From Swiss-Prot:
Protein name (Swiss-Prot/TrEMBL): Cytochrome b
Designated gene of the protein: MT-CYB
GO cellular component: mitochondrial inner membrane; respiratory chain complex III
Binding site for a ubiquinone: H201
Sequence intervals crossing the membrane: 33-53, 77-98, 113-133, 178-198, 226-246, 288-308, 320-340, 347-367
Upper taxonomic lineage: Eukaryota, Metazoa, Chordata, Craniata, Vertebrata
Length: 379
């Protein structure tokens, strides 16, 4: 008799995705982050759902409702900090997942890659709107500064900003709509993640060598289910250590002050995971130029399949490209550091140089080095 998991319409889909899926035999721990991102999304949706049961999206009561969650709701503090730090874990996994794709040439599957970039944008938008909800000082001023960037769009900019605000400043209407969008977007992200997997399973996974592995496949279960379980345990351990020992480590103290439109904080800065993009935005003295650089700093990922000039897919056997890749990683760390610093000498010039280097590496240096490697290998 045929196994139910291979015949039942629903069980069949799960079977082809997570059980009998043919997977390369040599994929490393860098391939764990897909499942970890799925776990992060589930954690965020569940904790977010319970927070939404007690949260009120009104300017008068939003801050108090978050305080109420932390003080009066059973384990409310735990749910709140799991949600806040869960976002940080989400972005750590995201950056490592994208970095893995860049290093091993996973972007050659361009449909999967482009949906991934759209997912990155969606997660960034969700995180930004979520940061506004507690209605602290940094929530309010972050929302004001970032939404105001749209006013740089010629002709329609100002109208667009007022349309997003639902008035002439960030106020009750803005908070309510941000809450609505923050609630719906994770479900859209979940749907997009399924499409991401659908396209991935059309081609099968890439592997560290970048070679076709059709002749050497193993079933996903039990080999990679057990491997993913280790990743899951490590992620939960890290998250809970952060939540239980140092929940405010990655937050901003300014957000414990209720929003006050009459008092601007000395340094307006976003959460740590946006600092690299914020540094690129600030490094250009022109408003529209800064906004374009900000958008393009993420959108540039979509160009990776077009900029791949190497005859080899992966960087595993390309030491020159590896060197450039790690310089890019160091550059992103530098940008993250600069994004959190005040706008003064020497941080301004460091930020500008780091921004130029970021775009130069991706658009110019990596493709050039790839061609040099082709020549060295007489390809």
């Amino acid at each position: 008799m045929t196994n139910t998991r291979k015949t039942h319409p629903l069980x069949k889909i799960i079977n082809h995705s997570f059980i009998d899926l043919p997977a390369p035999s040599n994929i490393s721990a860098w391939w764990n982050f897909g499942s970890l991102l799925g776990l992060c999304l589930i954690i965020q949706i569940l904790t977010g759902l319970f927070l939404a049961m007690h949260y009120t999206s009104d300017t008068m009561t939003a801050f108090s409702s978050v305080t109420h969650i932390c003080r009066d709701v059973n384990y409310g503090w735990l749910i709140r900090y799991m949600h806040a730090n869960g976002a940080s874990m989400f972005f750590i996994c995201l950056f490592l997942h994208v970095g893995r794709g860049m290093y091993y040439g996973s972007y050659i599957y361009f449909e999967t890659w482009n949906i991934g970039v759209i997912l990155l944008f969606a997660v960034m938008a969700t995180a930004f709107m979520g940061y506004v909800l507690p209605w602290g000082q940094m929530s309010f001023w972050g929302a004001t500064v970032i939404t105001n960037l749209l006013s740089a769009i010629p002709y329609i900019g100002t109208t667009l900003v007022e349309w997003i605000w639902g008035g002439f400043s960030v106020d009750k209407a803005t908070l309510t709509r941000f809450f609505a969008f923050h609630f719906i977007l994770p479900f859209i992200i979940a749907a997009l993640a399924m499409v991401h997997l659908l396209f991935l399973h059309e081609t099968g996974s890439n592997n560290p060598s970048g070679l076709i592995s059709d002749s050497d496949k193993i079933p996903f279960h039990p080999y990679y289910t057990i491997k993913d379980t280790l990743g899951v345990l490590l992620l939960i351990l890290t998250l809970m250590a952060l939540v239980l020992f140092s929940p405010d480590l990655l937050g901003d103290p300014d957000n414990y002050t209720p929003a006050n439109p009459l008092s601007t904080p000395p340094h307006i800065k976003p959460e740590w995971y946006f600092l690299f993009a914020y540094a690129i935005l600030r490094s250009i003295p022109n408003k529209l130029g800064g906004v374009l650089a900000l958008v393009f700093s993420i959108l540039i990922l979509m160009l990776f399949p077009l900029l791949h000039l190497s005859k080899q897919r992966s960087m595993m056997f390309r030491p020159l490209s590896q060197c450039v890749f790690w310089i890019l990683v160091a550059d992103l760390f530098t940008l993250t550091w600069i994004g959190g610093q005040p706008v003064e000498h020497p941080f301004i010039i460091i930020g500008q140089l780091a921004s130029i280097l970021y775009f130069a590496i991706i658009l110019l240096i990596l493709p050039t080095v790839s061609m040099i490697e082709n020549k060295l290998l007489k390809w």
